[in-house]
């Protein structure tokens, strides 16, 4: 053994070839600060070996290196800029030493090689991969850019266009695509990986492969003419401006850095990468996006812990076909859980099967599946008008019309057709689970399971724990949701649960703005372009359905009369009474027509202004800041109330539910991350200006206490240790 660290070791393999093996405690390798330091120490030992002829890098895990240790990021990002820059220089000196070894080097890459893992293998001369490889640089999705030389080496290896596509989009690619673009040099079966790697190294050692020529382009300026450079970078900047926008600075910074570094060799190019990385790491966007990643890990870990002793349902059923039922059935079948889809008429069953078939055909068109796979999946969805086979199902989700009487009747009838241990769930979006459970003989086997539309796209499923829901019931439904590829978040019961409970105060703020004379077009524009929502409130209401919102508004008002009971007729009432139900019938705040792809396209409709005039004061202008404040304060206050009342268990779960269920702008990180970034005291000052607007604008006492004591909702993060100690971690 030449060197043994906590996360890697170095040893002789054969005939002058050494192997450096990443083998961290636990299930995965991460390129954390300690591993970077250990890699430097291993290279120091290696540089003294006069008999060294070649080096093989490999992993003892199912994945090579999954990336940097993102749990370290928030503390690293608090380190002063100069110290962070020094540490990056140190880390890059380690990878440069790997790249500068006087012998050929090869990385045998299996599973994931992402972020720092990818940057590590870019420093070797050759890369041999297994078919399960996923390799790429996802840093821009975390609000930063590659910092270990990825923005320098990748363009010089692949050419500007392919590298920009990966770096700017934060993409990873599979083995075959990586081979095609030159990111890896070969793909071999797992059992042949080491044998193949040694064979390539031997060829390089004997001179059959020119490893020096392979290495040289990574040390030089990017080989692009002025015209080629202008075309590549102009197109890339245009694409990034269109897709990322101003709220996500990292992709544009990465493109501009690669452009500026193109005319320099490795050392100066790395300096430019360093100068760009450090300011990005100190942005609120980076902290928010890293926070989302960590929250996602926390939520998924919590679900895994909850279901560790539970068998995943093997047979499911959906009550109520149509678009929603068909979407749920598709998602379950697609992920390997056969499903019975029951309805009371053929028309709805046909609609549900058509929806499932449409989604599968899209997968076929994209090359994700072949015809055989499509036929196999669709055959596991069984449409039926009766309860045949329900005695075999493990879990049933009801997705019928949002009417408590109908839901109670359907659930009570179904309970008589299933085994005593079968779990029942309701896809209700607003009706309290306790109310629906009153119709059942076994309420302990019942809970809520709220999907979001469209089911195949929206990652969140709210699992609602009723007063009598058993732990086993919740665990079974969480297991099914996880199997479907969803992110389940368990909440406690109340009208609207968590997501809709906090959404409708937001809509109430919108209604009040319109009542006071705001133009809905400007409100949408501000909330989309300035705050960053994917849709403004008017557009969102049209997508949700004005009729659906009108009904849900009444349910929420009955549940929370002090805050959510209206004392006036509002814009939603006016549109509902005029049968303008949104996209579903082509008329809402906008008029909708199908575009060439069959998707609804919104158009201006002057008639809506006359309708809104009947429930509004004369038009007047509002500043962007006032619009944002009046829209967001009711939502933020309600989110805080949900935490204080125990409806949602933690700020992390609340923020993930908002991002995954409502599209809360990820660069804000969620409501609690946004509050912490603003500061509770600053938020309180803003909110107090609008308290006269009513109870929805009254700040909860718990938030006032946070402001008084200057306490954040997330635990404070301490800066990482000084750079000197990071080196030797």
Curated annotation (Swiss-Prot):
Listed InterPro entries: 3-OHacyl-CoA_DH_CS, 3-OHacyl-CoA_DH_NAD-bd, 3HC_DH_C, 6-PGluconate_DH-like_C_sf, ClpP/crotonase-like_dom_sf, Enoyl-CoA_hyd/isom_CS, Enoyl-CoA_hydra/iso, FA_oxidation_alpha_subunit
Matches recorded under Gene3D superfamilies: 1.10.1040.50, 2-enoyl-CoA Hydratase, Chain A, domain 1 (3.90.226.10), NAD(P)-binding Rossmann-like Domain (3.40.50.720)
Any one GO molecular-function label of the UniProt entry: NAD+ binding
Residue ranges, annotated region (Enoyl-CoA hydratase/isomerase): 1-189
Site residues by UniProt (Important for catalytic activity): 119, 139
Annotated substrate binding sites: 296, 500, 660
A single BP term in Gene Ontology: fatty acid beta-oxidation
Region (3-hydroxyacyl-CoA dehydrogenase): 311-729
Reaction(s) catalysed (UniProt annotation): a (3S)-3-hydroxyacyl-CoA + NAD(+) = a 3-oxoacyl-CoA + NADH + H(+); a (3S)-3-hydroxyacyl-CoA = a (2E)-enoyl-CoA + H2O; a 4-saturated-(3S)-3-hydroxyacyl-CoA = a (3E)-enoyl-CoA + H2O; (3S)-3-hydroxybutanoyl-CoA = (3R)-3-hydroxybutanoyl-CoA
The keyword Lipid metabolism appears for this protein: yes
EC number: 4.2.1.17, 5.1.2.3, 5.3.3.8, 1.1.1.35
Renumbered residue ranges of the record's region Disordered: 708-729
Active site, renumbered: 450
Residues noted as binding NAD(+) in the record, renumbered to the chain: 324, 343, 400-402, 407, 429, 453
CDD domains cross-referenced by the UniProt entry: crotonase-like (cd06558)
GO cellular component: fatty acid beta-oxidation multienzyme complex
UniProt pathway annotation: Lipid metabolism; fatty acid beta-oxidation
Pfam families: 3HCDH, 3HCDH_N, ECH_1
Subunit-structure text: Heterotetramer of two alpha chains (FadB) and two beta chains (FadA).
Family: In the N-terminal section; belongs to the enoyl-CoA hydratase/isomerase family. In the C-terminal section; belongs to the 3-hydroxyacyl-CoA dehydrogenase family.
Reported function: Involved in the aerobic and anaerobic degradation of long-chain fatty acids via beta-oxidation cycle. Catalyzes the formation of 3-oxoacyl-CoA from enoyl-CoA via L-3-hydroxyacyl-CoA. It can also use D-3-hydroxyacyl-CoA and cis-3-enoyl-CoA as substrate.
PANTHER family documented for this protein: TRIFUNCTIONAL ENZYME SUBUNIT ALPHA, TRIFUNCTIONAL ENZYME SUBUNIT ALPHA, MITOCHONDRIAL
Protein name as annotated: Fatty acid oxidation complex subunit alpha
Lineage, top ranks: Bacteria, Pseudomonadati, Pseudomonadota, Gammaproteobacteria, Enterobacterales
Gene: fadB
